[in-house]
Amino acid sequence: MSQTIPQLEETEDGSLTLYTPRFGEHYHSTHGAVQESAHIYLGLGLRQRLEQWTEPEGAALRCFEVGFGTGLNALLSWREAERSHRLIHYYSIERYPIPAELYRQLHYELSTAIPLSTAGGAVPSCEEALASAELAANLGTQGTKEVGSSTSSAPLGRLEDSHSALMRLHEAAWDEDVTLSRYFVLHKISGDLNALPFPAALDLVYYDAFSPESQPELWREELFAQLRRCCRPGAILTTYCAKGEVRRRLERSGFSVERLPGPPGKREVLRATAR
């Protein structure tokens, strides 16, 4: 086996991640791939942005993901687009796409309704992990809305079989718009983040690159400043990385940054809002 081909591993919530020898890191938290993505990107990012959304009906929310990876963030976002009946134009850049023989083994069971809490402190299942997105969407918000209450508290139902949906995401053509449903348009970008122009007029950014230790070139202040110029005022950026220097670089680049509680295994994460 090539030393650069990622290896499948099961995480504590039962969902799969990959370990990459190239960078010596996992694609997701080993405490739970689904619960990490649901908490940081769906809850603190997409659902928060949708709550603030005041654009006319039919206007697309433009999301940019740094690191397509396993496609889990895209899958959750597609599912949320169908649930909310909001059009999402989803851009995702990836320099090292995973091979077909590997992504065909991925499976995320996301089709059942979601309980709002996990009793007894047990490690949540994939379905229960998504409930953290309900809670995360309320973190750091103003007003008296009760934690756990949400416009998304109804059962989410099926997008379609989650495995076939994931395969459609991976098999979609690169470097062009691909309409996957009435509410979800995917545009995968093949290449290096430092060498390509960013999409314009962004409303939401999932900054999910490997760590600053593994990919320091993707955490430079100059890159954040370029990204800020491509964001609309009020755009939200979320990332698992809560390092102080990353926070300061984002702030100097034109974002207001807050630390928020992270998913299991992660004390804090960052959410930045374009000033």
Residue ranges and their predicted role:
Residues 195-204:
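A short acidic, Gly/Pro-enriched loop at the edge of an enzyme's catalytic core
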Residues 243-275:
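Class I S-adenosyl-L-methionine
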Residues 220-233:
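A short glycine-rich, Lys/Arg-flanked "PGG" loop and its adjoining helix->strand segment in the class I
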Residues 234-241:
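Conserved beta-strand signature within the Rossmann-like core of class I S-adenosyl-L-methionine
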Residues 106-121, 125-138, 152-196:
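S-adenosyl-L-methionine
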Residues 71-75:
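Glycine-rich SAM-binding Motif I of class I
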Residues 1-61, 78-112:
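Rossmann-like AdoMet
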Residues 63-65:
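Class I SAM-dependent methyltransferase core
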